[in-house]
Amino acid sequence: MLEADAARLKTDRLGYNPLHVLRADAATRRQEPAILTMIRSSPPMSVDSSPLPEALRHAASISRFMRRMLDSRPWLAAQLAGSLGQPLDSEAMSSFLANRGVDEARLRASLRHLRSWVVCHVLTRDLNGFADLAEVTETMTVLAEVTVRATYEVLREGLVARYGAPLSPTGWEQELLVIGMGKLGGRELNVSSDIDLIFVYPEDGDTGGNKVISNFEFFERLGKQMIQALADVTEHGQVFRVDMRLRPNGDSGPLVCSFDMLENYFITQGREWERYAWIKARVLAGERYHELEQIARPFVFRKYLDFGSINAMRALHAQIRREVTRRDRVNNIKLGPGGIREIEFTAQVFQLIRGGREPGLQVRATLDVLAVLGERGILTPQTVGELAEAYDFLRRLEHRLQYLDDAQTHDLPGNDEDCECIARAMDFPDYTSFLGVLDHHRAAVSRHFDHVFGDPSEEAHTLDSMWAAARDVEQAEPILSRLGYGDPSGAAHRLAALHGSARYQQLPNHIRSRLDALMPRVVEVAAATPGPDETLARCIDLIEAISRRGAYLALLQQYPQALRRVADLVGASRWAAQYLTRHPILLDELLDDRNLEPAPDWDALRAQMRDTLDTLEPDMERQMDVMREQHHAQVFRLLTQDIAGLLTVEKLADHLSALADLMLELALPLVWRKIKIRHRDDPAFAVIAYGKLGGKELGYASDLDIVFLFDDPAPEALEVYTRLAQRINTWLSSQTAAGILFETDLRLRPNGESGLLVTSIESFRKYQLESAWVWEHQALTRARFAAGDATIGAAFERIRCEVLRLPRDIAALRAEVLAMRRKMSDAHAGKSERFNLKHDAGGLVDVEFLIQYLVLGHAHRYPELTGNLGNIALLRIAGELGLIPAELAARCGDSYRLFRRLQHRQRLNGLLSLVAPDEVAAAREPVRALWTIVFGSA
């Protein structure tokens, strides 16, 4: 029952609770002992010879197959009487085979008797409310596994006796890997299903017996014998129909293939529908499944988001629907509108799109996939609940249709007697009531399917003709003018240049068709933004950058809301446009409304990323890419919130700084694991943040000022931690396929670029107390522990406070600070008449120097000044302490906040931190006044 219970728990997480599950659970708890007593007290009987126990009689009243089995197999009723009290597992089935005999002579009969027992057992439990859907599908899956493995072992033994074991060229014994596909692979097998199999073996070679044949011949013979043993219809019936059409090249391909052949097929010929089929692939027999997974996973789960899968799945489903309609089988609950296949497609298309980037989606069972999609917000809770409930209803109905005659059918019955049976089996008073609920579920499934797979490009757009003739600038200009473009001629020429470009002309036909469907909508959404001309130009830059990646075009084509958000974003910020162009994988972030929620859940992100990074071990390159992708995604989410006006500059900087801390925290243990000469489990090592990261004022493009400290007496500690620091720096700043994580600056360490890369905590203290320059103590005012060993972080904070609270000669300090300020001013002297927000007198640097001077000059008397509280808070404290006028301190804080906001605005638009002097004249005045009070000159 464990797996059935797990399935119920998953069902609960989906947010729905089908009545039959509750009913089955309650019935199981209340009635199983009574049922067992009733069955065991009755002698084994056929349907006609004497009254049957009620559980069997009820099942037989619905299932003609059950009646036939009881009549033709005198042993079956007694077998059922001993087993109905609990689900059947592999141990029970294997024991049955062992008792019947599974040598080659008795194999076929034993397998068929096993199936008769298992199917009658599960249908009786199901129809009497003792089994839920999870138990039925699990039992049938286990039956397939047991019979396939038994068949494989018995028949292989016979072939080995005749030809010897198949061997690789180096002498390793080879095995056949039997791969279960479809519902068998997903552990979702129905009661009258065929089984989809693929046969694969690791390496070519020859057998090692006296009569030598190739490995291919050996495994081909084994495969053929297995199919016959399972699928042949004998006087005892059949075990499973076997479908081999999912193998490479289908019916025209060889029955078995080697790993090399399979990999080559995936690379050169694998089609989208085969990716869909291989999602559920699972090895039933054979040990070398890890090697097979390494071959199949890159084919199924692409490294990047693959929205082109939607079109491929749409085409596949359209073909299936045409077949169903052509055969007048609209009542097919599997392939028809609103059927099981549409639920599976809706779930699995997101596996194809996102599975390569989100390992959590690399699961097989449909309900498990829906649960993950709901947890990650890819589908809404309502959608997940309705699809899961419909899936449960349709799969239970599917089983009841098949219980009638053990036929592989999915069509609703065509006669009144069977209609009445189905209604009763589904717990409805009549067939009309049943159809009402069925239609409700199918309508919900179709609605959700159409929402996911509806094709916006099929609808003609009013601007299609303009784009088709885009090179005719004179025709396009008046249309663009009416749409609201300020420079219709310029916009028309941009469109004409794109349409006539070699890049556009050389696109593959299917990608160019997507771009043709997209461009009229781009023109339309850009026109709706405040600056349509600039928005269109930036959108075209983005589209040119992604034009060869059909998946991104498909995303924008498939999701109009994403296209509108792109237009709003790039129209509002040149920097955002450039960031999105550099990292187009972030387009996916525009689909999730939760990304506009302004409070990142850092704990959840930390846990999720740790799990993901651990699963990728030891693939360092992929770990680096994942960290970059996640960092870019989080930055982009903050950017969308920022542009939407949901974040202040201060709150944005807090979030960006927290994100950087998290990346440092995650990187450190990953890098440490890869240090071969490490001498302890956890490094006695800490990362100290300086500058904007230290002060929690990080911007979108800020580099990280960091220093590395260690506290470890081991003789090899310096060498080990130097290597660790080097690797961390490389991890952060290396360019990979996903970009870089951060630019780093390590020059604030003791002795700067000429100093050691890592410093012991004792040496750091000695340096700060005896050798550091005043400007290094200024930098220390904004430093803090960021990642690593918290004990070292606490020791650093004690040293920082000790140094900052040293009594200083105030005159000498003033002279040093002023000299450093003049040096910085000279280095950034510009000829612009515009005001430099950072470096000009009365700007940001002046405020920072004022605060640093006040801290260094007075912290020995007022230790509260050493808190890493931010510049505005420190100004307020200095005012409250009477070190500066409180009213002037507050005005300087307001000025500092304004300067940062203006600087942020400029950077979002890709501009230097230069503004018109009149815009900041009032804000400069209190800063210059405070400078005069503190330093004696403006």
Swiss-Prot record:
Residues 1-457 are annotated as: Adenylyl removase. It comes from the Bacteria. The gene is glnE. InterPro entries: GlnE (IPR023057), GlnE_rpt_dom (IPR005190), NT_sf (IPR043519), PII_UdlTrfase/GS_AdlTrfase (IPR013546). One of its GO terms (cellular component) is cytosol. It catalyses: [glutamine synthetase]-O(4)-(5'-adenylyl)-L-tyrosine + phosphate = [glutamine synthetase]-L-tyrosine + ADP; [glutamine synthetase]-L-tyrosine + ATP = [glutamine synthetase]-O(4)-(5'-adenylyl)-L-tyrosine + diphosphate. Gene3D superfamilies: 1.20.120.1510, Beta Polymerase, domain 2, Nucleotidyltransferases domain 2. It holds the Pfam family GlnD_UR_UTase. Belongs to the GlnE family. Its EC number is 2.7.7.89, 2.7.7.42. This is Bifunctional glutamine synthetase adenylyltransferase/adenylyl-removing enzyme. Involved in the regulation of glutamine synthetase GlnA, a key enzyme in the process to assimilate ammonia. When cellular nitrogen levels are high, the C-terminal adenylyl transferase (AT) inactivates GlnA by covalent transfer of an adenylyl group from ATP to specific tyrosine residue of GlnA, thus reducing its activity. Conversely, when nitrogen levels are low, the N-terminal adenylyl removase (AR) activates GlnA by removing the adenylyl group by phosphorolysis, increasing its activity. PANTHER family: BIFUNCTIONAL GLUTAMINE SYNTHETASE ADENYLYLTRANSFERASE_ADENYLYL-REMOVING ENZYME, GLUTAMINE SYNTHETASE ADENYLYLTRANSFERASE. GO terms for molecular function: [glutamate-ammonia-ligase] adenylyltransferase activity; [glutamine synthetase]-adenylyl-L-tyrosine phosphorylase activity; ATP binding; magnesium ion binding. Residues 460-938 are annotated as: Adenylyl transferase. Signal peptide: none annotated. Its cofactor is Mg(2+). HAMAP family: GlnE. The keyword Zinc does not apply. One of its GO terms (biological process) is regulation of glutamine family amino acid metabolic process. Keywords: ATP-binding, Magnesium, Multifunctional enzyme, Nucleotide-binding, Nucleotidyltransferase, Transferase.
